[in-house]
Amino acid sequence: MRGIYQQSYKYFESNVIMSIGAPLANYLSAKRVGNLLYLSGVIAVDPTTRKVINAYDDLPMNAQIQLQTLGYNTGQLSVDIYEAPAASQSWFVLNRIKDIVEAEGGQMKDVFKLVQYFQDLRHYPVYNRVRELFCPESVVSTVVEVSRMLPNDQVLIEVEATAYFN
């Protein structure tokens, strides 16, 4: 299991989740205001190594198995080399969102809005299939294509989320 999954969440007196690992910049990863939880854009960077997730091997085994059920991580180099970056980043980002929401006592069904940024909209169909693992019910959704994302051009997907806890 990689470092990120061994990291503990950092809490502060205001019960705001600051990050999983060290943030890449000086901002809040998430903030709870009453029953609402706002998550900043989540990208597929392991905060312990600051490495961009780009391959199935960057993910834990359970993620690799989940992606196989969707037809990804086939073991065929000619297929995996093209799909792995988008599929692995999609799983990583959505799993981080799930972890943060659950740390605040919620579930993914509490997430009602996602804003998804893509460097290339051709990655959206891959992301959308992976999203169904985490959000089987429809959510309010915005999809935007952007020219670049931080920290580098390997980051293909960024997702903001908003959850409401009843």
Locate the predicted segments by residue.
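Short, polar/acidic, helix-capping and beta-turn segments at strand->helix junctions
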Residues: 2-166
